[in-house]
């Protein structure tokens, strides 16, 4: 089962490599709402609410939904279908991310006195280093619409499988080549 989980996550990560590089960041043509391609997908769009590393709704998030390129959503559907056969499914935290959201992340990292979410999201690091350490990027692959943040859930219990850390945890446990 662990082998399958790593395979699924590898396939999803590779979606970003096949994203069209010339697609305009704000142009949504060719984008779809993920749940329209995968009706059984579960959402927990953290940046639409306050349960995220900023502690507030992130700029640019106007609804609790996820957008991806049509190709990425169709590839994700294949993964969802395979997982469903095992009694598992996908829970999407984020897909397309507008640049204004990334800009919000940058502003947050510079407000060093704001440590509201430190205990939950970055207890061991200085928030000013989240970019330097590779937890967040100033030019996110999410802005192309072919990158997705997700986890796997048990369909019966609706509980997330243990991936080592929670969503958006900035620490050694959540990155394989942590400096």
Could you describe each region identified by the protein language model?
Residues 1-26:
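Bacterial Sec-dependent N-terminal signal peptides
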Residues 17-95, 102-179:
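Extracytoplasmic cell-surface/polysaccharide-interacting catalytic and binding patches
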């Amino acid at each position: 089962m662990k082998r399958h989980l790593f395979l699924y996550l590898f396939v999803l990560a590779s979606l970003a490599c096949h994203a069209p590089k010339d697609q305009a960041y704000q142009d949504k043509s060719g984008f779809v709402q993920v749940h329209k391609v995968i009706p059984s997908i579960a959402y927990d769009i953290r940046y639409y609410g306050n349960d995220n590393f900023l502690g507030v709704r992130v700029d640019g998030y106007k609804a609790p939904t996820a957008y991806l390129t049509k190709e990425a959503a169709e590839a994700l559907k294949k993964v969802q279908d395979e997982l469903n056969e095992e009694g598992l499914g996908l829970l999407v935290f984020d897909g397309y991310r507008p640049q204004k959201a990334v800009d919000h992340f940058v502003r947050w990292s510079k407000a060093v006195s704001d440590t509201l979410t430190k205990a939950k999201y970055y207890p061991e690091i200085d928030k000013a280093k989240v970019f330097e350490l590779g937890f967040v990027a100033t030019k996110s692959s999410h802005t192309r619409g072919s990158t997705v943040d997700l986890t796997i859930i048990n369909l019966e219990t609706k509980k997330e499988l243990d991936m080592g850390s929670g969503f958006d945890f900035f620490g050694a446990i959540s990155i394989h080549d942590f400096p």
